[in-house]
Swiss-Prot record:
Pfam families: FA_hydroxylase. The gene is erg3B. A motif (Histidine box-3) lies at residues 261-265. The keyword Oxidoreductase applies. Disruption phenotype: Does not affect the susceptibility to amphotericin B, itraconazole, fluconazole, voriconazole, and ketoconazole. Leads to the accumulation of the non-C-5 desaturated sterols 24-methylcholesta-7,22-dien-3beta-ol, 24-methylcholesta-7,22,24(28)-trien-3beta-ol, and 24-methylcholesta-7,24(28)-dien-3beta-ol. This is Delta(7)-sterol 5(6)-desaturase erg3B.
Amino acid sequence: MDVVLDVLDTFVFDKLYALLLPAKSFDLLDQDSVVDYNSHINRYVTLTPSQYAVESSLARDNILRQFLSLFITIWAFGLLLYLTTASLSFALVFDKRAMQHPKFLRHQIRLEIGQALRAMPVMAALTAPLFLAEVRGYSKLYDFPTGSPFPLYTYLQYPLFIAFTDFAIYWIHRGLHHPAIYKRLHKPHHRWIISTPYASYAFHPVDGWCQSLPYHVYPFLFPLQKAAYLGLFVFVTIWTVMIHDGEYALDSPVINGSACHTIHHYYFNYNYGQFITFWDRIGGSYRRPNRELFDKQQRLQQTEIQRQVEEMERLVKEVEGSDDRCYEQDTKKTS
C-alpha cells in the first residue's frame, strides 16, 4: 500500500492537504527535500512529486495524514470495486428467476446495497490501522521476487495465502454463528436467504471486518510480494461477489464455490469456508449442494422450492427463534 500511497499523494492528496491545511512559511523550510519523496514507487518507475508535496502542514509521513489517506483510499476503492463487480455479475451472470423465490425479500436489492454502503466506511476505518502498520514498515511485504525467502516462494505465496486465510476465515465464520454472537453481528448478512451479488458486502461492519482480518494479518506473519498482495486483494473482492452470484457453474468437491455458499445461506450451519471445502470436511460442517441446483430447470421446480422452503423455515426458527423478514411474495398476497 506504500506504493499506492505514493501515487495517490502525488496526484490527489498532496494538493488536497495543501489546500485544506496549508503550511506556514517557516514550515516549508523544515520539510525534507522533495527528492526523497516517492521512494516506494520510484523502485518501479520514476514519479516526480509536484510542488504541493511540501505545501501542507501535514507532511506525507505524518501518521494522522497517512491514516486519513488510507481510510479514504480503502473506502473509495472498495466501494468502486464492489459496485462494479456486483453490478456486472448481476447484469451478466445472476439468474433473475431467483427473485421469484418465496424467500426473496421485498426491495431486497435496495436493502443489500444500502447495508453494504453503510458498512463500508466503518470497515474502512477499522481496516486502515492495519494498512497503516504496513506503510510504516511493520509487515513482511517485499517489492521484487529477489526479496522472497527462496525462488520457489514466488509461486508458493499464492496457495499459502489461500490456505492460511481459508483456515482462519472458517473458524471466524463458524464462531460468528455461535448463538451469543450471531444475532448481534452475523444475522444482518443472513437476512438474505436468497442472495444476489449485492449481498456480497451487505454485512454488519464488524462482521465484515472480522472476516477480512486474515487477509490483512497474513503479511505480518509471512512474506508476501506487494504486487501479489494488491492482486489478491482484488481477487478476494471478486471471489466474494462470485460466491453470491447464484450461478452454480462449478460442481466441485474441493472448491467452495457459489453452490456451496448458497447452501450456507439456505441452511445456515454448513459450508463456512471461503475458498475450499477442506476445513468444512474436517469440522463436520460440509454439505454437498443438491444436484438440482446445477440444473437450471430443476432448481426452480415447485417441488424443489417447496422442499427448500420447508427446511429453511425450520432452520430459521431453530437459529433465530422468529422470522422478521418481509418477503416479496407475502407482500403480493396481502396487496
